[in-house]
Amino acid sequence: MNKCYIEIHSTNKAKNDIDILMNRAGYRNIGSSKKPSGKIGKFFVKLGIILKIPFCLHKNEILLIQYPFKKYYTYLCRVAHFRKCKVVTLIHDLGSFRRQKLTVPQEIKKLSHIDYIIVHNPSMKRWLEEQGCKVPMGCLEIFDYLSETKAIDYCPVTSVPQVIYAGGLGPRKNAFLYQLDDHISSYELNVYGK
């Protein structure tokens, strides 16, 4: 069974890393290899992808879609099923949490169009199940970003335990970071992000 994915260049590192990993794993890109510039460029590249998808999918393929896929998600799922393909979605974030543009029932309905969901952790899986999601799910458990930097083989133990956080630093999405002083005074916190 052949596998494919839709590459849509994003400002989101996690999504871009998944595109790279899918390519390395032999998945066929049915998206765009062109990196658009500006809102109008992005709109036309995405529109081109949406229009060509029905002609790029082959019977019995597995299509991986990264979520959120803001527009045309349900359309893509329907086209893939019409072409007798299986649809797998890797969830990075849920719209009902992220910006509350979707209600929880709307999101669950949107996700009901797929065959399998890959979630980040058991908590996300449990939450989706509690909200009525019936789609089979698997957990990544941990998501590591790709890096050109060579990993350190040995890290010396320090007298003060260290906690390292890498990710978004904005208070809107990560308010807990601004409340840690009250809880981890005996730890050294190293924060990486913007």
What are these regions (language model features)?
Residues I152-K194:
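Conserved catalytic-core segment of nucleotide-activated headgroup transferases in glycan assembly
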Residues L51-H58, R78-R83, S96-I117:
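Membrane-proximal helix-turn-helix segments that form the acceptor-binding/catalytic region
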Residues C4-N12, L64-Y67, C77, L90, ...:
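Carbohydrate transferase catalytic cores enriched for Leloir-type hexosyltransferases
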Residues R99-L102, I114-M137, N174:
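A short, active-site helix/loop in glycosyltransferases that binds the activated sugar's phosphate group
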Residues M1-T74, H81-K84:
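N-terminal pre-catalytic "stem/leader" segment of glycosyltransferase-like enzymes
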Residues C139-K150, L169-P171:
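Short beta-strand->alpha-helix junction loop in the catalytic core
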Residues Y67-F69, D93, N121-S123:
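Helix N-cap/beta->alpha junction signal
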Residues Y5, R28-S33, L63, Y116-V119, ...:
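Short, hydrophobic beta-strand segments that form beta-sheet elements in well-ordered domains
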